Swiss-Prot record:
InterPro entries: 6-PGluconate_DH-like_C_sf, 6PGD_dom2, 6PGDH_C, 6PGDH_Gnd/GntZ, 6PGDH_NADP-bd, 6PGdom_BS, NAD(P)-bd_dom_sf, Pgluconate_DH. This is 6-phosphogluconate dehydrogenase, decarboxylating. It comes from Shigella sonnei. Pathway: Carbohydrate degradation; pentose phosphate pathway; D-ribulose 5-phosphate from D-glucose 6-phosphate (oxidative stage): step 3/3. The gene is gnd. Substrate binds at residues 91, 117-119, 175-176, 180, 249, 276, 434, 440.
Length: 445
């Protein structure tokens, strides 16, 4: 409800009159009461709401993904005319969007599945917007979406036509997977700095402030520096009294499931999903901590040197994560015939969304230089970073393993990097085993 309200207010603030409807009359009245003088027009029946709109009608749905979306569409259909446009801005599974697009197209309606990132504040002030569906329908809503989208530093709005049917929601799903990876990598960096150097919250905030002024400059690093020094009403550091169980809404899982369907090695992002799952086994972990032995963390040595190693490891880990995510976008684009523009996708992530970061421009540049590049690690800038920073990543992972500090995504980054650069892997033995017990055959060199 908050996302829908904020998007309505955003659209209204750009000079539009907005018809609004909610199943709950009270919620509609509440929005009107809280926003006097705004060009928001309330309606209390679907029929009146639809009839209030100019044709072709442009209807933005912001409802809980799943059955709720189908129910909302079904309630609208009796009052729609051919050519009307429904925009689904929810966190919808892309296969559902493909299905709805197909069904509504057959009835003469247009359906635009649209990823919206930036949370409640982004919805109000300018989100990153990822629309997918019929190109001609997108052209009819583009003027509105362009006006309400976040604006990057170079003045470009953070919205672009992504591709047919489920492309927009697919890109949003991968965006969310990348977000999982970013957050877990940052959490592991925090764990290493606390476990290896015993940094105070003030020192952690200072470290992240410095990081945010360099290559790692991003929304997530920026908010993390603030989180470290936030105190509760009792004067305790808030982060230190938050239970170590990370919840999830399932979008990271969808990204990993799609990777399995496509045969894409999305290891880092998948480890970040699993890290949330194991965090939720709090009772088991507490019990296991009293039974299972392991090393106690020893000092990581020189403070400045280790902080810099962790910074480098974090940046290279982030690059590996995005390389995996964009490789998956390429595989999905081929599978679903979307013709995705990867440079443009990186561009619209530069503002408004949760993963906004300075280095996204480097991704856009890499695809501008070579649109067909198979993997971002092969682009000159990222190859150079890998050359310069891989030793730090290896050192940090080795330290973590020796000292019993779990770093699933840092470790996944090293494993993927070494696997990807290996001309020969031991898979020949696996294939021989498969042939031995199952007559699966093999290819000779």
């Amino acid at each position: 409800a908050v996302m829908g309200r904020n998007l309505a207010l955003n659209i209204e603030s750009r000079g539009y009159t907005v018809s609004i409807f909610n199943r709950s009359r009270e919620k509609t009245e509440e929005v009107i009461a809280e926003n006097p003088g705004k060009k928001l027009v309330p309606y209390y029946t679907v029929k009146e709401f639809v009839e209030s709109l100019e044709t072709p009608r442009r209807i933005l749905l912001m409802v809980k993904a799943g059955a709720g979306t189908d129910a909302a569409i079904d309630s609208l259909k009796p009052y729609l005319d051919k050519g009307d446009i429904i925009i689904d801005g929810g966190n919808t599974f892309f296969q559902d969007t493909i299905r709805r697009n197909r069904e509504l197209s057959a009835e003469g309606f247009n359906f635009i599945g649209t990823g919206v990132s930036g949370g409640e504040e982004g919805a109000l002030k300018g989100p990153s917007i990822m629309p997918g569906g019929q190109k001609e329908a997108y052209e009819l809503v583009a003027p509105i979406l362009t006006k309400i989208a976040a604006v990057a530093e170079d003045g470009e709005p953070c919205v672009t036509y992504i591709g047919a049917d489920g492309a927009g929601h697919y890109v949003k799903m991968v965006h969310n997977g990348i977000e999982y990876g970013d957050m877990q990598l940052i959490a592991e960096a925090y764990s290493l700095l606390k476990g290896g150097l015993n940094l105070s919250n003030e020192e952690l905030a200072q470290t992240f402030t410095e990081w945010n002024n360099g290559e790692l400059s991003s929304y997530l690093i920026d908010i993390t520096k603030d989180i470290f020094t936030k105190k509760d009403e009792d004067g305790n550091y808030l982060v230190d009294v938050i239970l170590d169980e990370a919840a999830n809404k399932g979008t990271g899982k969808w990204t990993s499931q799609s990777a399995l369907d496509l045969g894409e090695p999305l290891s880092l992002i998948t480890e970040s999903v699993f890290a949330r799952y194991i965090s939720s086994l709090k009772d088991q972990r507490v019990a296991a901590s009293k039974v299972l032995s392991g090393p106690q963390a020893q000092s990581a040595g020189d403070k400045a040197e280790f902080i810099e190693k962790v910074r480098r490891a974090l940046y290279l880990g982030k690059i590996v994560s995005y390389a995996q995510g964009f490789s998956q976008l390429r595989a999905a684009s081929e599978e679903y015939n979307w013709d995705l523009n990867y440079g443009e996708i990186a561009k619209i992530f530069r503002a408004g969304c949760i993963i906004r970061a300075q280095f996204l421009q480097k991704i856009t540049d890499a695809y501008a230089e070579n649109p067909q590049i198979a993997n971002l690690l092969l682009a000159p800038y990222f190859k150079q970073i890998a050359d310069d920073y891989q030793q730090a990543l290896r050192d940090v992972v080795a330290y973590a393993v020796q000292n019993g500090i779990p770093v699933p995504t840092f470790a996944a980054a090293v494993a993927y990097y070494d696997s990807y650069r290996a001309a020969v892997l031991p898979a020949n033995l696996i294939q021989a085993q498969r042939d031995y017990f199952g007559a699966h055959t093999y290819k000779r060199i």
